[in-house]
Amino acid sequence: MLDVEVIRKDFPILDQIVNDEPLVYLDNAATTQKPLAVLETINRYYEQDNANVHRGVHILAERATASYEAARETIRKFIHAGSTKEVLFTRGTTTSLNWVARFAEEILTEGDQVLISVMEHHSNIIPWQEACRKTGAELVYVYLKDGALDMDDLRAKLTDKVKFVSLAHASNVLGVVNPIKEITKLAHQVGAIMVVDGAQSTPHMKIDVQDLDVDFFAFSGHKMAGPTGIGVLYGKEKYLEQMSPVEFGGEMIDFVYEQSASWKELPWKFEAGTPNMAGAIGLAAAVDYLEKIGMDAIEAHEQELIAYVYPKLQAIEGLTIYGSQDLAQRSGVIAFNLGDLHPHDLATALDYEGVAVRAGHHCAQPLLQYLEVPATARASFYIYNTKADCDKLVDALQKTKEFFNGTF
């Protein structure tokens, strides 16, 4: 069990009043708040160690480089990668997935297929649309059954034509957690490369990329109590060796001639220019913070909150919840609509009560088209949320329903 009240003291942003109400922050799927440990680590880096990495021999440069590479090792341990060669720092999940799709362009040919699902974030759709457009490959979608991934549909479409499978570990709308280990086995049976968008899973559960046996795994720092502008791409070494750099410039080179150049070894051949040093170090601080709490404890806490709030939400007349009703398949994300009330109006009404939620298509328009809704509201939970926050959400929804009664 988490001591949430102690945890909340580490997040000063939560201690504020919004519209004369205590802030209840339930937009964690969009971004999470940052603990003092992360803020202080970043501040200390800029105050004491700020210098460019891998370049200078002076003490500041050596300290900065040591901290930057120590951060890579922290991430390696956190996701259980086999080597730091397999851990690339990027700007975030979007960048990571774009890099993999660019690699796919080197492999795909006309008649090949890429398999994704209808629940994907745009960052795991558009790069594949582009890769298929450029190569003549076909983008194939797996659809849903009872609010979760239709595994029968996946098995039927997973043929030897499929060269890449790219799926969200957890949906940022439905909250469903996909059986990635099982899907990876199926993908490898037909020789496909398995790519996972881990943006919505890595902050909330223990990740072991070797146990999952995935070929690529992407996630972002800002969704797991870390800073913005930093993310990670894990890739199996054999694929990263084949993969061409996406960006070119300083630091990723071994030697430059007038008409050609050679690249550094992994992982540095992918990290051109001055990297986000403070971001990487801040992300490592976030990982340390989360691991002190315990990833199993974090997952259990969020499951407890969902089990508590879900039936209360179901009891609100006119409220529609999207996704599987099997709570064992769900993460701490709940998308919903209240009657015919537009989600933006609903989110605005909740904000008047101090409750911060997301409203819109959540960068998942194909999913919402499939669900036949233009948008939803979304509440998403994290380590600092409480059952009192759940009660406040339910109370605010009831007040909103009463205020708009008769209009939907």
Where are these regions (language model features)?
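Pyridoxal 5′-phosphate
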Residues: 1-408
